[in-house]
């Protein structure tokens, strides 16, 4: 089976990377915020990012063609993805990042299966987010 990869800026993602990110996204919703308004904004950004990734994954899987397929991510999408990856790695490593994540065993198992992808993506998204304007 041919591996499909897509380039996001200077980050190339395969299907397993997209699946890992999608698996981690729900954790970003549990990160505390300073205000209810900020929490609402974060939830909206998370929902938009999740929809983009799921739509992209669905269209890529169904097409199975070599034709170029583009996903357009905004700076907010990159931030959401990086937060989700960071949260997932913290959960898997037991690292305290100031948030008591509520996660069931099934979700933890799914994250564990994707640990390698998440760990590999983390430095790339960190560097990308560090370059984004405030």
Mark where each language-model region is.
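Positively charged, low-complexity terminal tracts
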Residues: 1-134
């Amino acid at each position: 089976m041919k591996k499909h990869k897509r380039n996001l800026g200077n980050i190339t993602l395969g299907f397993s990377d997209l699946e890992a990110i999608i698996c981690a996204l729900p954790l970003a919703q549990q990160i505390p915020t300073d205000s209810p308004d900020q929490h609402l904004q974060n939830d909206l950004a998370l929902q938009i990012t999740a929809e983009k990734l799921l739509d992209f994954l669905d269209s890529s899987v169904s097409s199975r063609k070599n034709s170029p397929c583009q996903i357009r991510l905004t700076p907010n999408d990159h931030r959401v993805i990086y937060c989700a990856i960071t949260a997932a790695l913290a959960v898997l490593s037991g690292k305290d990042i100031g948030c008591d994540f509520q996660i069931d065993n099934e979700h933890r198992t799914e994250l564990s299966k994707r640990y390698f992808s998440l760990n590999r993506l983390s430095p790339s998204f960190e560097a990308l987010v560090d370059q984004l304007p405030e």
